[in-house]
Amino acid sequence: MLGENMNKGFLTIAQNGEHDYVKMAYLLAMSLKTSQEKYNKLSVIVNENEEIPEKYLKLFDNIIYVEKPDSEWKIQNKWRYYGLTPYDETIVLDCDMLFFNDISTWWKCLEDKTLEFTTKTINYRGNEITSTYYRKTFESNNLPNLHTALFYFKKTKQNEYYFRLVKMIFENWEEFYKLLKDPPKFLSGDVAYALAAKVWFNRKWDNFLKFTHMRSRLQDDDLFDEWNQSLPSFFTNYNKKPELKVNNFNQIYPFHYIQKDFITDEVIEFYEDTLRLL
């Protein structure tokens, strides 16, 4: 890979199971192509032998094949980002995210950093989320409030050792959870990364990274468990770039939509049509 831009890119895991995560990664790739002015390359980690539609191939920078986990809960490979990324500088994303604005300034600000996690999230109204409803384990164990849905890292020796510790926790999570108060019932990527960070680093994690987190109980409304059953939303492309309004609030930050049925064939077609306009 040649050129400055090739040294920076996005990475996501899209291992299909109950849901079509590769399709979500395709939509994510389109949202990056339509929103990012400089760095818009997305590499995708998929199940071995996964058949990728031709139109997806044109938008994925790299396709990285890994073994399919036995469990339907496809997070077991989330420790592997460090070894699998093709980039010198990587922003890791959950594949159920959308971008509407350019984040080139983020990349610039991250140039003198080596590892940064999102620690603050907002709801669809743009208000900072303070609820710990989904974060009892973090609160009970004084873990750093890290979110792996969007984080950045460089290839460094210290980070290599950190990711080795993350791997150890992933592979022995039930034993590690015995050391925690109020542990989750299942393996949590956020908990594993936060626990490793607490052990390995002596630092604060506050920074500017931010995304809109659409878990229903984090909004300023009394919603159904599936937020998209309570809140109206619609896409527009008046300026030849997609925009999303949720309950008439324009979405500015990376949008972690969570609900897989939020992505319909109509949304895919909307993005494909918009991409053709560029």
List each language-model region with its residue ranges.
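N-proximal low-complexity "stem/linker" segments adjacent to membrane-targeting elements
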Residues: 1-23
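A glycosyltransferase accessory/donor-loop signature
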Residues: 2-9, 44, 58-59, 141-147, ...
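Conserved glycosyltransferase catalytic-site signature
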Residues: 22, 75, 79, 186-193
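Short, acidic, metal-binding catalytic loop of nucleotide-sugar glycosyltransferases
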Residues: 31-39
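Short, hydrophobic beta-strand segments that form beta-sheet elements in well-ordered domains
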Residues: 40-48
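Active-site-proximal specificity loops/subdomain of glycosyltransferases
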Residues: 47-85
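GT-A fold catalytic core of metal-dependent nucleotide-sugar glycosyltransferases
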Residues: 65, 74-127
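Conserved catalytic core of nucleotide-sugar-dependent glycosyltransferases
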Residues: 108-169
